[in-house]
Amino acid sequence: MGFLKILRKQRAREREMRILILGLDNAGKTTLMKKFLDEPTDTIEPTLGFDIKTVHFKDFQLNLWDVGGQKSLRSYWKNYFESTDALIWVVDSSDRERLLQCSEELKKLLGEERLAGASLLVLANKSDLPGAIDVNSIAQVLDLHSIKSHHWKIFSCCALSGDRLVQAMTWLCDDVGSRLFILD
């Protein structure tokens, strides 16, 4: 039995996923994570460094790594790539001025070898705000349709209400689960 097959069998038993949550500062990463965990969202501070939370969802154990998005912290993102099964890229859909910067940062991430094959969930957050950019336009600016190295999907959502968050996480778990936990 090959080493990879042994690792897959071990992970299949554990049904554990490592999910990295990234995006520019003020995109709503921490609020989304807290809402998903059913934690209070009334006092959110910018994440300086990272925060790890574990939750059971859809028969999986999800290890959620929420990493700060400030410009000064982005060079440290690479320290969190190892063993990542999925990347959640959070976009502030109301911030037109930084959408191009958001696209550039995502392209850098997708070129990282240690993220190769990781499922990509793009959450267009703050979709409830006036003037928010629709998901098709965001997908176009992020050039998502050209991505061949990762399974991906984009959802509009609202971190404060939790709108479409469960649906998005269900897609992510189904996608990662179909890659990692099917044994031959």
From Swiss-Prot:
GO biological processes: cortical microtubule organization; embryo development ending in birth or egg hatching; female genitalia development; mitotic cytokinesis; protein folding
Gene Ontology cellular-component terms listed: aster; centrosome; cytoplasm; microtubule cytoskeleton; plasma membrane
A Pfam family per the record: Arf
InterPro entries assigned to the protein according to its UniProt record, in alphabetical order: Arl2 (IPR045873), ARL2/3 (IPR044612), P-loop_NTPase (IPR027417), Small_GTP-bd (IPR005225), Small_GTPase_ARF/SAR (IPR006689)
Residues given in the record as GTP binding sites: 23-30, 66-70, 125-128
Keywords (A to Z) from UniProt: Cell cycle, Cell division, Cell membrane, Cytoplasm, Cytoskeleton, Developmental protein, GTP-binding, Lipoprotein, Membrane, Myristate, Nucleotide-binding
Annotated tissue distribution: In the embryo, strongly expressed in migrating hypodermal cells. Shortly before the beginning of elongation, expressed in many developing neurons where it persists throughout adulthood. In the larva, highly expressed in migrating hypodermal cells and the uterus. Also expressed in vulva, spermatheca, sheath cells, distal tips cells and proctoderm of the male tail.
Description of the deletion phenotype: Worms exhibit abnormal vulva, gonad and male tail development and disruption in embryonic proliferation. Subcellular defects include a lack of microtubule cytoskeleton and excessive chromosomes in oocyte nuclei. Many embryos show a lethal phenotype arrested at the bean stage just prior to the beginning of morphogenesis.
Cell compartments where the protein resides: Cytoplasm; Cell membrane; Cytoplasm, Cytoskeleton, Microtubule organizing center, Centrosome
Single GO MF descriptor: GTPase activity
Domain of life: Eukaryota
Residues with lipid group (N-myristoyl glycine): 2
Disulfide links within the chain: none
Functional description taken from the UniProt entry: GTP-binding protein that functions in embryogenesis, cytokinesis, germline development and microtubulule cytoskeleton dynamics.
NCBIfam families linked: small_GTP
Protein family according to the UniProt entry: Belongs to the small GTPase superfamily. Arf family.
Name of the protein in its database record: ADP-ribosylation factor-like protein 2
Organism ancestry: Eukaryota, Metazoa, Ecdysozoa, Nematoda, Chromadorea
